[in-house]
Amino acid sequence: MKLAHKNNTGEEQSLEDHSFNVANKAREDAEFIGQGDLLFLLGMFHDLGKADEKFQNKLTKNPTMHVDHAYAGAKYLYEKIKIRLSAKGVDKATRLQFNEIVAYVIAAHHGMFDIVDLESEQHAYNKLRNRIARPKSDYHFDSDVTNFANFLETKLEHYGYQDLGMLIDKSFENYQQALSKLDCQDSSEEVYYQSCFVRLYLSLLKNADILDTINAYGLLINPLKQEEKIRLNRSYLEAIEKKYGEFGSPTTRLNEIRSQIAERVKSRGESDSTGIYRLDLPTGAGKTNLSMRYAFHQLVDQNKSRFFYITPFLSILEQNAAEIRKVTGDAGVLEHHSNVIRQTDD
């Protein structure tokens, strides 16, 4: 059995289990944006290099040894995608674009390497191509990595794919579908969005990989199910509406205006489609509460999954985070900035 993880008490996780756990979770998270097949492909092969004898020795005999395991999945898929899409008649430029995105995400899932340096210039390659093309004499790519990849591919029917060719086809369709929604004005804009795809795919892959690594020897983190997320969002909405209900009827002209704004924000939160909107109000208008009212109606009525509150000053952010928590409670709230201090017993 090939191992993906082994801890100091001897507990183990197989590479097969880890590969398909990550593939399934990444696909599940990416389905709502139509990228599920592509993320399954990335998840399935992201740790392919761990099949190498050198990495297996690291796990079982020499845990401090450094082994580059991220390159192998990129190298393997680079060739498979090239052969498959070429046979399908996909033009070279389009194929290379897709191929390099897939390879980069896998090769960079333990750290990005998009800075040009003397080494990459010396080889006349970008770092990605140099990394996957450079011979590694002490690795066992054909005997270990390719054989394990072939083994994984025999399991694909259990996950809805006839074979690797079908998975590559569907993954390419996912990417083309996403690309077709963009209206790029020039090549620089197109390249920018390609970099955005890379970071999106990396985020989805890393989320699934980290979760399964944490849970490798038993369930430690259990993400909220969709039904639980819906209930949580509804609880936010009920809480903010309760707060507005406690204000009572306005007794001054200023409070009448505030009440009118609040009702308009509520209506827009219920009906606004995806877009960029601006809430331009003076200090004292109650923008924190208004933002929550708008956002929580969007979460529930427009089926949004997240609400980000961003502000430029830490003092304001800390103050408003506290105000938000007074309404929502702690469940589902992540406060992330440089003044957050992790509290520990020691």
Regions found by a protein language model. Give the residues of each.
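Conserved helicase motor
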Residues: 3-10, 14, 314, 334-345
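Short, high-confidence coil segments that cap the C-terminus of an alpha-helix
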Residues: 35-36, 274, 304, 330
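Walker A/P-loop
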Residues: 271-298
